């Protein structure tokens, strides 16, 4: 009986819960759930940490872009091009601000001057002169010859002490050749296109 009891107790005592099919399945399922929950927590923490690091990097890059001042390169190129000297730039700005519309507003009034018998012409800025007398003196000095002109009061007036062999004429806006001095100086400046020093015997 003792052996039987001992033998009867031996199978029940030697039976392990791990070898039982139902208990083994339950233990495996619990272990799998624990592993899955651990993996999910790890994955969530990894994804959260990686996404937060990406967000921090993007915010740092945006802050760096905002801190760098944007330089309008195109506007600087257009503003500084063409490379001209400061005084020339200011002169061009003044000329553009002044605009046209008359001899008084213009800064320069260059006209071509030709002398009969001389193949090479000259250029003269009429706005640097203050009247017909200064124009005549300037042309006499340029061409080394005495020149006369017709003024408003008289047909011809010679320079005192000199015998003029040439007379000054000009081409107006209509293409007609006129005697210099027939109209007031301001009207002459608004209509003159070209000057010609002609011989007296041909006028």
From Swiss-Prot:
InterPro entries: AUX/IAA_dom, AUX_IAA, PB1-like. Residues 10-31 have a biased composition (Low complexity). Residues 108-202 form the PB1 domain. It comes from the Eukaryota. GO terms for cellular component: nucleus. Aux/IAA proteins are short-lived transcriptional factors that function as repressors of early auxin response genes at low auxin concentrations. This is Auxin-responsive protein IAA4. It comes from Oryza sativa subsp. indica (Rice). The gene is IAA4.
């Amino acid at each position: 009986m003792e052996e039987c009891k001992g033998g009867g107790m031996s199978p029940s005592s030697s039976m392990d819960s791990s070898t039982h099919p139902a208990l083994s399945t339950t233990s495996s399922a619990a272990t799998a759930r624990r592993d899955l929950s651990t993996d999910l927590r790890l994955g969530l923490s990894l994804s959260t940490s990686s996404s937060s690091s990406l967000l921090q990097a993007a915010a740092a890059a945006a802050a760096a872009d905002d801190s760098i001042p944007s330089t309008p390169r195109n506007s600087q190129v257009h503003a500084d091009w063409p490379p001209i000297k400061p005084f020339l730039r200011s002169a061009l700005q003044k000329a553009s601000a002044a605009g046209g519309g008359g001899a008084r507003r213009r800064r320069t009034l260059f006209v071509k001057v030709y002398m009969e018998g001389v193949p090479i012409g000259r250029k003269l800025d009429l706005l640097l002169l203050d009247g017909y007398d200064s124009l005549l003196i300037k042309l006499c000095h340029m061409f080394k010859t005495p020149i006369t002109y017709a003024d408003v009061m008289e047909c011809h007036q010679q320079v005192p002490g000199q015998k003029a062999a040439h007379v000054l004429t000009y081409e107006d806006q209509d293409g007609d050749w006129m005697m210099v001095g027939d109209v007031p100086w301001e009207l002459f400046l608004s209509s003159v296109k070209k000057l010609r020093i002609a011989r007296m015997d041909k006028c």
